[in-house]
């Protein structure tokens, strides 16, 4: 909550209750509530985490929601401690306060509930060594790693990658203190167009009808293991993932011994479930 910094507002409580009800069909299903998000969705974290009293109330509110909905855990998606993303409040003490907040949440919800966090590809902003005993696993947002005419989520480095790619993101988190078996690789169900000089997000399900992509030709980057659409000069104009590239990433996650994979996000997949089915098949084969 952006006014008192301790209450937790669920965007669509009716829909979330429907999701929680899925546990009746599959009792082994794990459902977590993710709190935060990009930009103003993370407003209030810094103000709350710097105050011991507010940390405790926030943690108790997390516990209350777990009990109310009968779900399995909390995911903290603070984007990002110490960073003024989209103008949100931040302080250099956020990293230390983040750990204190997570300790308070763990104390409130107990050891039998899941506590996870979302982290950018750079592995900055967190003290992972201090968080290791508190957090069950880290969801690496190994996407949004592109500038103009670059891959959004390359598995490996190529001439079309920016400063980060999936393999590097995993390595940085491992070097920062988190073991591979507690790392989850993020998979994007969307891409970015560089047509017209502006980076524009386009969902996988909308690719065929998107006018910006007309006249572009699909190519495969054999080094980065991702597809892209290029103009007549071979210049990357649209970066995205498809079933093939997600298959390579799932194979990498299994061979590397990662905790697993996660996707962002369900709504961006097509009606046939092309991407989520590809991920499921690759992870279960």
Each model region followed by its residue ranges:
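Glycan-recognition patch characteristic of GH18 chitinases/ENGases
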Residues: 1-66, 276
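Alpha-helical structural signal in soluble globular domains
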Residues: 18, 22-25, 65, 100-108, ...
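Conserved, mostly hydrophobic/aromatic
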Residues: 33, 76, 105, 138, ...
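Short, acidic/polar
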Residues: 50-68, 120-129, 240-254
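Glycan-binding loop/region signatures in secreted carbohydrate-active enzymes
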Residues: 181-252, 272, 277-285
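A short, acidic, flexible beta-alpha connecting loop/helix-capping segment that sits on the rim
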Residues: 265-272
């Amino acid at each position: 909550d952006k006014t008192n910094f301790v209450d937790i507002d669920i965007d669509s409580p009716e829909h979330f209750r429907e999701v929680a009800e899925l546990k009746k069909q599959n009792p082994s299903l794990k459902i977590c509530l993710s709190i935060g998000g990009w930009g103003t969705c993370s407003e209030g974290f810094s103000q709350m985490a710097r105050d011991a009293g507010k940390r405790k109330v926030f943690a108790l509110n997390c516990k209350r929601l777990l009990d109310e909905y009968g779900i399995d855990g909390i995911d903290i998606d603070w984007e990002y401690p110490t960073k003024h993303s989209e103008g949100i409040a931040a302080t250099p003490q956020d990293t230390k306060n983040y750990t204190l907040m997570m300790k308070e949440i763990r104390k409130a919800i107990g050891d039998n509930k899941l506590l996870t966090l979302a982290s950018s590809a750079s592995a900055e902003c967190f003290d992972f060594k201090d968080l290791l005993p508190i957090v069950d696993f880290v969801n690496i947002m190994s996407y949004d790693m592109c500038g103009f005419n670059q891959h959004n989520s390359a598995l490996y480095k190529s001439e079309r990658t920016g400063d980060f790619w999936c393999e590097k993101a995993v390595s940085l988190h491992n070097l920062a203190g988190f073991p591979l078996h507690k790392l989850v690789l993020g998979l994007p169900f969307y891409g970015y167009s560089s047509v017209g000089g502006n980076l524009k997000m386009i969902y996988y399900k909308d690719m065929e009808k998107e006018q910006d992509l007309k006249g572009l030709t699909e190519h495969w980057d054999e080094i980065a293991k991702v597809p892209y659409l290029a103009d007549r000069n071979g210049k990357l104009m649209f970066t995205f993932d498809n079933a093939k590239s997600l298959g390579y990433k799932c194979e990498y996650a299994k061979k590397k011994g990662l905790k697993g994979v996660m996707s962002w996000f369900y709504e961006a997949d097509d009606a046939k479930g092309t991407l989520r089915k590809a991920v499921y098949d690759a992870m279960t084969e």
